[in-house]
């Protein structure tokens, strides 16, 4: 248990930031799931639209520190390759 006033505040701040990061991660995963579903269905236009919507969410998560920037770049790159491979 926190003893000092500053330690108690730190616990409150961490709880808020954890909740925000959890929401951001969940939102990003939702967009990623939509891309996966579009790719699985084989619909190229749907996959392109889903990727177009997901890319800013993935990069925003990286910018906010929820995921590493290289992880975000790798996800976007691999999704782009898979969308281009659809014919």
Swiss-Prot record:
InterPro entries: Ribosomal_bS20, Ribosomal_bS20_sf
Record bears the keyword Transferase: no
This protein's UniProt keywords: Ribonucleoprotein, Ribosomal protein, RNA-binding, rRNA-binding
Record-level GO cellular component terms: cytosol; small ribosomal subunit
Family per record: Belongs to the bacterial ribosomal protein bS20 family.
NCBIfam families reported in the protein's UniProt record: S20
Protein name: Small ribosomal subunit protein bS20
Native species: Parvibaculum lavamentivorans (strain DS-1 / DSM 13023 / NCIMB 13966)
